[in-house]
A protein has these predicted regions:
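A short, polar/charged loop-to-alpha-helix boundary motif
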Residues: 68-79
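Helix-adjacent hinge/juxtasegments
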Residues: 81-111
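Small-residue (primarily alanine) positions within well-ordered alpha-helices
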Residues: 32, 36-39, 49, 60, ...
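Short beta-strand scaffold segments in enzyme catalytic cores
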Residues: 47-53
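N-terminal amphipathic/hydrophobic targeting modules at extreme N-termini
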Residues: 1-2, 6-7
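Short beta->alpha transition motifs characteristic of CBS
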Residues: 59-67
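Zinc-dependent deaminase
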Residues: 9-42, 104-155
Length: 155
C-alpha cells in the first residue's frame, strides 16, 4: 500500500480516510450527509451537495428543494453548482469538486460536465436514477465533452 509524505496510508480509489487530506474529505461528506438528513426532515428527497475549491475548502452546501420550491429542477447538485458559480463569479468551476449524498442523475451529470467540475464524490449509488456509475453512465458517452474524476460509494 502506498504511503504519502506524511507517513499515512493513501489510495486514490477507493478513497481511504487515513490521510490528513482524507480526514478533511470525510468532514465534507459528513456535512453533506447531515444536510441530506435535514432535507429529509423538511419533506424532501434526502439529498444534499457541496462544492469545494482547489484547496479543498468547502464554499457552498445545498439541499434538495424540489418539494419546498415546487420546482423539479431544484436538485441539490444543481443548486450547489449555481451557488458556487455565483460565489466565485465564474461560469466554469475548473479545479472545484462536487460532494453529493446520492449518485447524480442524468440532468445533474450534464450540469457537472458543463460546469467543468474536476471531481465528483458521492456517498450512495442510485440504481434507479443514477447516471454516473449506474444507469446511462453519462460520462462514458462519447458525446460527453468533459469527464470529471469519479469517486462513488464513499459515504
Amino acid at each position: 500500500m502506498p504511503i504519502n509524505g506524511d507517513g499515512y496510508f493513501c489510495l486514490v480509489k477507493p478513497v481511504i480516510y487515513a490521510t490528513k487530506e482524507g480526514m478533511k474529505m470525510k468532514g465534507h461528506m459528513d456535512k453533506v450527509l447531515a444536510a441530506a438528513a435535514a432535507a429529509a426532515k423538511a419533506g424532501e428527497v434526502p439529498v444534499a451537495a457541496a462544492i469545494t475549491d482547489a484547496k479543498g475548502d468547502l464554499i457552498v452546501l445545498a439541499e434538495n428543494r424540489m418539494v419546498r420550491d415546487g420546482n423539479a429542477l431544484h436538485h441539490a447538485d444543481l443548486l450547489a453548482i449555481e451557488a458556487a458559480m455565483a460565489a466565485t463569479g465564474q461560469s466554469r468551476l475548473d479545479g472545484y469538486d462536487l460532494w453529493v449524498s446520492l449518485e447524480p442523475c442524468t440532468m445533474c451529470a450534464g450540469a457537472i460536465a458543463h460546469a467543468r467540475l474536476r471531481r465528483v464524490y458521492f456517498a450512495a449509488h442510485d440504481e434507479k436514477a443514477g447516471a454516473v456509475e449506474s444507469g446511462v453512465r453519462f460520462f462514458d458517452n462519447p458525446s460527453c465533452h468533459h469527464r470529471p474524476e469519479i469517486y462513488g460509494g464513499i459515504g
